[in-house]
Design a protein with these regions (language model features):
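Active-site rim loops that border cofactor/substrate pockets in soluble metabolic enzymes
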Residues: 1-41
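C-terminal functional extensions of proteins
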Residues: 54-57, 64-100
Length: 100
């Protein structure tokens, strides 16, 4: 969608290893030149299992708040975990509504 100019004002790059996506220093150390490296707003994963590992790591190890939505169906699918906070569940609903 980005290549077709359907997403305006958006920088897309990848694949990037997680450290390069979230750490400009790691990307520079590895010689990766990217406007996105170290400053990403969205991390896409190749499948639900990888996404689940990343999602729970951010929440439980990093103390973050995440939103989870599955794309590719006719409408976005909200996917939350029973252990998610109320805020995470709300952010998932908001993200899905914004994507529809």
């Amino acid at each position: 969608m980005n290549r077709r100019k359907q997403i305006k004002g958006c920088l897309v790059d990848g694949p990037l290893a997680l450290d390069n996506a979230v750490s400009k220093e790691a990307a520079e150390h590895k010689g990766i030149v990217s406007d996105v490296a170290g400053d990403c707003d969205v991390i896409l994963t190749p499948d639900i299992n990888t996404g689940n590992i990343l999602y729970k790591s951010i929440n439980f190890l990093g103390g973050g708040v995440s939103a989870a939505v599955i794309m590719g169906a006719k409408v976005p699918v909200v996917l939350t975990s029973r252990s998610d906070s109320e805020k995470s569940k709300l952010m998932s609903i908001v993200l899905a509504a914004a994507m529809d």
